[in-house]
């Protein structure tokens, strides 16, 4: 139709808030299946600021998925017990916009590695980074790619990483069945299949409603230990 819809919708969601299926469920797969929406999901304060400002400047509808577990509701500590506080540069994004540049649609390699690639987004970026540190003590170096934007997602950055490492894990917090991670994995396989040394893996939450119980919620979503085991299995010789 050609009509502009300059609207940004912020949706708080995600685990570690003990709010059950009403607020903790990850719904990105619902939204990515609706053509025409731009979907962003920051993993840190700087990206949260930049992506929100850039979304506001677009003539298209943007869904901005903000993870409640990263808010720092517990004295500046996330639901995973970490501090991701940082001084946010409010000028850089404006300079990019003035130059016609944008972070939307561009993934970022947040950790370099040569043995395996983890592609992920949102709060799972921090789980991936912790798992990567775990296995680095055993001589395995993992590259972590933060998508930042789900639609359009930066397939090129992901493919280039997998062409280098030869192994792929896609990590999502949402339930495994029907998750967006399968779309990401399929797209990468189309271009990098012959370079894969092991079958690619999609890690997601158990196929169950998000429990209110802290113990049960922690059991259903991907943990550092689960991701570490998958890395070690993929890199076993």
Question: Predicted segments — roles?
Answer:
Residues 1-58, 235:
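Conserved thiamine diphosphate
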Residues 1-10, 16-18, 68-69, 73-237:
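Thiamine diphosphate
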């Amino acid at each position: 139709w050609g009509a502009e819809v300059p609207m940004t919708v912020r949706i708080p969601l995600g685990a570690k808030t003990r709010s059950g299926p009403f607020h903790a469920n990850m719904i990105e797969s619902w939204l990515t299946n609706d053509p025409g929406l731009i979907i962003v999901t920051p993993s840190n304060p700087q990206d949260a600021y930049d992506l929100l400002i850039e979304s506001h400047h677009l003539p298209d509808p943007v869904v901005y998925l903000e993870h409640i577990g990263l808010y720092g509701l517990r004295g500046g500590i996330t639901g995973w017990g970490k501090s991701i506080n940082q001084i946010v540069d409010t000028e850089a994004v404006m300079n990019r916009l003035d130059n016609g540049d944008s972070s939307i649609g561009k993934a970022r390699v947040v950790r370099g590695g040569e043995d395996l690639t983890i592609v992920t987004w949102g709060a799972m970026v921090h789980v991936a980074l912790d798992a990567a540190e775990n296995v680095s003590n055993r001589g395995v170096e993992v590259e972590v790619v933060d998508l930042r934007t789900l639609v359009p997602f930066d397939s090129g950055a992901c493919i280039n990483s997998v062409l280098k490492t030869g192994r792929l894990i896609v990590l999502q917090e949402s339930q495994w069945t029907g998750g967006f991670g399968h779309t990401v994995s399929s797209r990468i396989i189309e271009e990098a299949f012959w370079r894969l040394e092991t079958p690619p893996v999609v890690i997601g939450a158990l196929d169950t409603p998000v429990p209110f119980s802290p113990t049960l919620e922690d059991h259903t979503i991907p943990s550092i230990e689960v991701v570490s085991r998958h890395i070690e299995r993929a890199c076993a010789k």
